[in-house]
Amino acid sequence: MAEKIRVGLFFGGNSSEHDVSKRSAKNYYDALDPEKYQIFPVLISKKGIMIDSETSKRVLFGEDEDELLAGLPNKNADIFGPIDSIRNLKLDVLFPSVHGNLGEDGTLAGLFRLMNIPYVGSGLRAHAISFDKVITKELMTVNGIRNTKYIVIFQNDKNKPDWDSVSKQLGEVVFVKAANQGSSVGVSRVTNAEEYENALRDSFQYDEKLLVEKAVESPTELEIGLLGNDRVITSPIGAHWAPGQDHGSGWFDYKNKFVDNSKMKYQIPAKISPAKSKELENMAVKAYKVLGIKGFARIDFLMSKDGEIFLSEPNTLPGNTNMSLFPILFEAAGMNRSQQAEKLIQLAFEEFKREQNISYSFKELGSEKLGQFDIKK
């Protein structure tokens, strides 16, 4: 009998999506075949500390996290603690299910690469670029991928644009967003000067850089899942809208996404024309490659009333809860959650093998003589 593949399943983190991450990770745990995989859960606490696998498993299976972690020493608060903990588990592949900070921003991917162990998903660079809404939009614009008009405001700007200036540039309805947050944290819909000032104060709590973008009037919210490294497969396109709203009448705040999502409305496949479906798919694949994403992603789009499609934002560590769109989209294509998890691990090994063939060092011509100088008088 072949040895089981040892999987480190990372979840939690210090973002607002800590509990969502638990639900995602538990579904991955349940999806992976126990005859083939031995899974070692690794919790990252709300303080950003890596917890031992035995305690982590108890949290994953529903025991009270705060009670279990009370009094535990902060022994993993330095860089060597987490590395030693992971190495001691002798893991074959690392599977992050940490949303928001530490996960989607590339922190864990950087640690995993430093350890030279295969891991699921994108590398540090793709995560970090995709997590920053401003950099993402700048890259999309340069590469001809349609997105909404925007401006950028920094906290230390001495002359921040007032509402009159913003509304003249972007229109009477805008969104103010913290550049490096997920799950609609630090996001406000703004229609007047008072709301604008309040939105700036709120969003600057979460980031020193803000994105202010033109709203798409009554948009259809669309999304597509992507799986792959260099070769990418796409899911059917889905449409969704929030509880209590008509199709195309609202936007998703944190409450819609995580507190009251049991009544979320879906339409898979979305009722858009074949031509628009192809256009969106092409935009998604191009964005995936421009951003350097590996493994998987969900990319969100907005379609205006006149059929114009705008890329909204990518998600490089999409959720895996019962209500998460990425797994639902691929289930609609006939790929169940076990097959999805298996594919992600396969892609992790493939990408690791590819990276091992890349040389990151070189011997400069004549470098053996560096430091030797022939000084002529």
UniProtKB/Swiss-Prot annotation:
GO biological process terms held by the UniProt record: cell wall organization; peptidoglycan biosynthetic process; regulation of cell shape
Residues annotated as binding ATP: 167-222
UniProt cross-references to InterPro entries, sorted A to Z: ATP-grasp (IPR011761), ATP_grasp_subdomain_1 (IPR013815), D-Ala_lig_Van_CS (IPR000291), D_ala_D_ala (IPR005905), Dala_Dala_lig_C (IPR011095), Dala_Dala_lig_N (IPR011127), PreATP-grasp_dom_sf (IPR016185)
Cellular localization per UniProt: Cytoplasm
Co-factor: note: Binds 2 magnesium or manganese ions per subunit.
Positions with a binding annotation for Mg(2+) 1: D300, E313
Reactions accelerated catalytically: 2 D-alanine + ATP = D-alanyl-D-alanine + ADP + phosphate + H(+)
Record-listed Mg(2+) 2 binding positions: E313, N315
Cofactor dependence: Mg(2+); Mn(2+)
GO molecular function: ATP binding; D-alanine-D-alanine ligase activity; metal ion binding
UniProt keywords, alphabetically: ATP-binding, Cell shape, Cell wall biogenesis/degradation, Cytoplasm, Ligase, Magnesium, Manganese, Metal-binding, Nucleotide-binding, Peptidoglycan synthesis
Chain segments annotated as coiled-coil in the UniProt record: none
EC number, as in UniProt: 6.3.2.4
Residue ranges of every copy of the ATP-grasp domain listed in the record: 137-346
Pathway the protein takes part in: Cell wall biogenesis; peptidoglycan biosynthesis
GO CC, alphabetical: cytosol
Pfam families: Dala_Dala_lig_C, Dala_Dala_lig_N
Domain of life: Bacteria
Family the UniProt entry places it in: Belongs to the D-alanine--D-alanine ligase family.
HAMAP family linked to this entry: Dala_Dala_lig
Function: Cell wall formation.
Name of this protein: D-alanine--D-alanine ligase
Organism name: Oenococcus oeni (strain ATCC BAA-331 / PSU-1)
